[in-house]
A protein has these predicted regions:
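Pyridoxal 5′-phosphate
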Residues: 1-138
Length: 138
């Protein structure tokens, strides 16, 4: 961009994002995320051997973030298998090296962060994919 040239693409993108948020009705977000949390509980994710929930963060907008340690396999390996099923998770030390090193023995953690675009079916697909990935790794 030249000096003084407005960022038209950014302005238009922000406008479309605002329209999308209004279309989704922000007040429905909390209900959506609570439903996803129930789907997480109904799935087998919390019962997968070696996948231990260490942190469940409830955000003000009703969104949940789940952080797991992996015993017997590396979280990056799990992430690679999930990627084969088009599932993205965050792995590593998540900019919290001292605490993650302490809880994971230096291996890192696996974080699941459902979004407004995540469906309950996505949660069950994630559960199935996690089970398949871990069976292959153990």
């Amino acid at each position: 961009h030249e000096v003084g040239t407005p960022n038209l693409a950014g302005i238009l993108g922000l406008g479309r994002a605002a329209e999308w948020m209004n279309y989704l009705k922000y007040e429905n977000f909390k209900e959506h995320f609570t439903g996803l949390d129930f789907a997480m509980s109904d799935s087998d994710i919390f019962n997968i051997k070696g996948l231990d929930l260490i942190y469940k963060d409830y955000r003000q907008n009703g969104r949940y973030v789940y952080t797991f340690t992996c015993t017997g396999y590396h979280p990056s390996d799990v992430s690679a298998f999930l990627g084969l099923d088009n599932i993205a998770v965050r792995v590593g030390k998540l900019c919290a090296h001292p605490i993650v090193n302490k809880v994971s023995g230096g291996r890192g953690v696996l974080r699941i962060s459902p979004g407004i675009y995540t469906s309950k079916e996505d949660i069950f697909k994630l559960s199935d994919s996690l089970c398949k990935a871990i069976q292959k790794l153990v």
